[in-house]
């Protein structure tokens, strides 16, 4: 009888030793706990992969701030920057589309309240009365609204000029009204109406400085840049007549 009891006890102990330990009885830091952590990490990683795949199938719309550099065609400008704008020129204009060159063109949306003044100036430049009176200009010029990506500032440095500006979720372009010579020699002798027997002459484009929105590092700032503004006649006295 005692042998049978010993046999049963030994079999019971062997069974307990051979049975896998339950997770509830595993001490902290044991291999079973490590396996459980690995399992949880694997499940979490699998969940992240599933979520990432779902996001790839249904990508969320990008915000302006989240887009890669170079993928955004315009910069977002603080409206306070325009409140600090000084020395405004009628030759610099922020508009949603190319400004009209004549009074008959359809009106467009301007950034400031000087649209009427700008349109009047444009009309006067386009419809100058001298040709209607039989008068002729010494030099022929052409005027048009243009955009710029680079320019020379007042210090002689090449700077980056902003083309597209995002202000209050509205995209404006920065336009410059430039005037330049159509031809350096409107007549074979140079400038029109100049006595070529006494004078050498030619037409040349002159420039002036206007305040424009430029990029300085990663910030937008106002800076004086040079643009073409007029076509003038340059004359020099012929040396053989001295």
UniProtKB/Swiss-Prot annotation:
Report the subcellular localization.
Secreted
| This protein's UniProt keywords | Cleavage on pair of basic residues, Disulfide bond, Growth factor, Lipid-binding, Metalloenzyme inhibitor, Metalloprotease inhibitor, Protease inhibitor, Secreted, Signal, Toxin
This entry's Gene Ontology molecular function terms read: growth factor activity; lipid binding; metalloendopeptidase inhibitor activity; nerve growth factor receptor binding; toxin activity
Q: Does the keyword Transcription regulation apply?
A: no
- Its chief place of residence is secreted
Family annotation (PROSITE patterns): NGF_1, NGF_2
Which intervals of the chain form a coiled coil?
A: none
Please give an example of a GO cellular component term from this record. synaptic vesicle
User: Which InterPro entries does the UniProt entry name for this protein?
Assistant: Cystine-knot_cytokine, Nerve_growth_factor-like, Nerve_growth_factor-rel, Nerve_growth_factor_bsu, Nerve_growth_factor_CS, Venom_nerve_growth_factor
Looking at the record, which segments are called Disordered? 45-69
Indicate the secretion signal residues.
1-18
Reported tissue expression: Expressed by the venom gland.
Which family is this protein grouped under? Belongs to the NGF-beta family.
So what does this one do? Nerve growth factor is important for the development and maintenance of the sympathetic and sensory nervous systems. It stimulates division and differentiation of sympathetic and embryonic sensory neurons as well as basal forebrain cholinergic neurons in the brain. Its relevance in the snake venom is not clear. However, it has been shown to inhibit metalloproteinase-dependent proteolysis of platelet glycoprotein Ib alpha, suggesting a metalloproteinase inhibition to prevent metalloprotease autodigestion and/or protection against prey proteases.
Q: What is this protein called?
A: Venom nerve growth factor 3
Could you tell me which species this protein originates from?
Pseudechis australis (Mulga snake)
Cite the source lineage. Eukaryota, Metazoa, Chordata, Craniata, Vertebrata
